[in-house]
Amino acid sequence: MNLIIWPTYLDSRKSRSEGRRVPLEYAVESPTASEILRAARKLQLEASMESDRAYPPSWWESSGRVVVEYNGKKSELLPKIARLVRSSRKR
């Protein structure tokens, strides 16, 4: 199953009502679609980036999105990806 992951889902500057889907302890400031793509590939998932897309509630910000082939729940995958993005920034 293909899951779409928008950078907003992992953004610590966004509230839950604005689209963040992970707890603040996992969220990062201004994540990019390319960081999410690298994290998904690190988890050995089939993933592709669509850089010309914008998150519908904030259509004026062209943030891009990542499409991931994953058979589990999105709510299980997002914290894993967020942790990898966060740890890659600490290096």
Curated annotation (Swiss-Prot):
Keywords: Cytoplasm, Ribonucleoprotein, RNA-binding, Signal recognition particle. GO terms for biological process: SRP-dependent cotranslational protein targeting to membrane, signal sequence recognition. It is found in: Cytoplasm. It comes from the Archaea. Its main location: cytoplasm. One of its GO terms (cellular component) is signal recognition particle. InterPro entries: Signal_recog_particle_SRP19 (IPR002778), SRP19-like_sf (IPR036521), SRP19_arc-type (IPR022938). It holds the Pfam family SRP19. GO terms for molecular function: 7S RNA binding. Belongs to the SRP19 family. PANTHER family: SIGNAL RECOGNITION PARTICLE 19 KD PROTEIN, SIGNAL RECOGNITION PARTICLE 19 KDA PROTEIN. Involved in targeting and insertion of nascent membrane proteins into the cytoplasmic membrane. Binds directly to 7S RNA and mediates binding of the 54 kDa subunit of the SRP. Part of the signal recognition particle protein translocation system, which is composed of SRP and FtsY. Archaeal SRP consists of a 7S RNA molecule of 300 nucleotides and two protein subunits: SRP54 and SRP19. This is Signal recognition particle 19 kDa protein. It comes from Methanothermobacter thermautotrophicus (strain ATCC 29096 / DSM 1053 / JCM 10044 / NBRC 100330 / Delta H) (Methanobacterium thermoautotrophicum). The lineage of its organism: Archaea, Methanobacteriati, Methanobacteriota, Methanomada group, Methanobacteria.
